[in-house]
């Protein structure tokens, strides 16, 4: 998801005690999530799973706030939470704002301090405690929280698309991947490592992203062969049941089926935003089933990883959930995005957010999870 602006000021949320990362050996299970044919397996159960997104949880500065979210997810039986594993800056903040990596003058500095990766440490620790599984990505296509452009700016590349091929940038990117993966490679709370949030390479030959995906996923597997790896793309570039609309074309440099066939990619992802893409809401059902068919053909499960609208959440998104749940090849969905109320106020609302214990939450979480559980019996 591309955010329209910075939605969360974290300097004012209090300061938490941040300790060096240590695994929580009291986690609900030590079994790592995996795939089984066209399905996911979590905690020994193979099937379809519901979840959500929270880009902001790793930027909270109060541990109690993180625990509140995780406890609500666990109580709601939302098994998977996708979080931002990046927070790139070109200038070091001085106001207490959380940041993970500084890019400046051709160098990159990883922040492992209390206002850096120790905040992500606590997200993993809390996820272990509450039995939630995390998808952690490493960089953003968009400029929110720095993104690829932060690298491009610091290393003097000509265009954002150079991120994928610039040797110095890729070395810094891989160094960050190594830093994050090495912190959590022993944690059963990790569902998957994700190359990026919505990677695109507009106007590029599809070989550019294919080669980058192949190389990066192979590198991640060399660091951690036990966890799943995925791309984090929107599902663009698909010739299965194509209606010729832009998302099906290769204009963003992606070939969904070919990329999914890479041996070091364990499952596929797709996103769904008709309001942003200029398509109808009903169009989304075909988008889901087309990807399900592609996933089935490749023999790997796919995850409807992001989907959202700004109004009429239940009426619009519930049919998508039903379509995904009934489609062979799709094994889970994560709505965008989770919302809750803290002691200091509500979590960010980018327009797609709906909040815990509201009528939309009942429709799209409580009822949805109940339907999944009923179907799996």
From Swiss-Prot:
Optimum temperature is between 60 and 70 degrees Celsius. Keywords: Carbohydrate metabolism, Glycoprotein, Glycosidase, Hydrolase, Secreted, Signal. Optimum pH is 5.0. It holds the Pfam family Cellulase. It catalyses: Random hydrolysis of (1->4)-beta-D-mannosidic linkages in mannans, galactomannans and glucomannans. Belongs to the glycosyl hydrolase 5 (cellulase A) family. It is found in: Secreted. The gene is manA. Substrate binds at residues 84, 197, 273, 336. It comes from Aspergillus aculeatus. The active site is at 198 (proton donor), 306 (nucleophile). Its main location: secreted. Residues 1-18 form the signal peptide. This is Mannan endo-1,4-beta-mannosidase A.
């Amino acid at each position: 998801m591309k955010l329209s602006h910075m939605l969360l000021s974290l300097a004012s949320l209090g300061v938490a005690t941040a300790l060096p990362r240590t695994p929580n050996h009291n986690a609900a299970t030590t079994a790592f999530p995996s795939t089984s044919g066209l399905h996911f397996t979590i905690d020994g159960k193979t099937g379809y799973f519901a979840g959500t997104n929270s880009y902001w949880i790793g930027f909270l500065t109060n541990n109690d706030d993180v625990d509140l979210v995780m406890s609500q997810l666990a109580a709601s039986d939302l098994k998977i939470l996708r979080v931002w594993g990046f927070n790139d800056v070109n200038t070091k903040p001085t106001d207490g704002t959380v940041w993970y990596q500084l890019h400046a003058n051709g160098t990159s500095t990883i922040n492992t301090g209390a206002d850096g990766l120790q905040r992500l440490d606590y997200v993993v620790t809390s996820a272990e405690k509450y039995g939630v599984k995390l998808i952690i990505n490493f960089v953003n296509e968009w400029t929110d929280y720095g993104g690829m452009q932060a690298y491009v700016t610091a290393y003097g590349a000509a265009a954002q698309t150079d991120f994928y091929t610039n040797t110095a940038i890729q070395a810094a990117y891989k160094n960050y991947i190594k830093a994050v993966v090495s912190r959590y490679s022993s944690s059963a709370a990790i569902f998957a490592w994700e190359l990026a949030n919505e990677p695109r390479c507009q106007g590029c030959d599809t070989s550019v992203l294919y080669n980058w995906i192949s190389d990066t996923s192979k590198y991640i597997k060399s660091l951690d062969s036990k966890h799943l790896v995925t791309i984090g793309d929107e599902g663009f570039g698909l010739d299965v049941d194509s209606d010729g609309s832009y998302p099906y074309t290769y204009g963003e440099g992606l070939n969904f089926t070919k990329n999914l066939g890479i041996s070091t990619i364990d499952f596929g992802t797709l996103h769904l935003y008709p309001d942003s893409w200029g398509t109808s809401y009903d169009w989304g059902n075909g988008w889901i089933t087309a990807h399900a068919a592609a996933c089935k053909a490749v023999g790997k499960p796919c995850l409807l990883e992001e989907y959202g609208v700004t109004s009429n959440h239940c009426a619009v998104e519930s049919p998508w959930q039903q379509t995904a749940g009934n489609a062979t090849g799709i094994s889970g969905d994560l709505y965008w995005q989770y919302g809750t109320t803290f002691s200091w106020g509500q979590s960010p609302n980018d327009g797609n957010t709906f909040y815990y214990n509201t009528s939309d939450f009942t429709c799209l979480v409580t009822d949805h999870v109940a339907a999944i559980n009923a179907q799996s019996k």
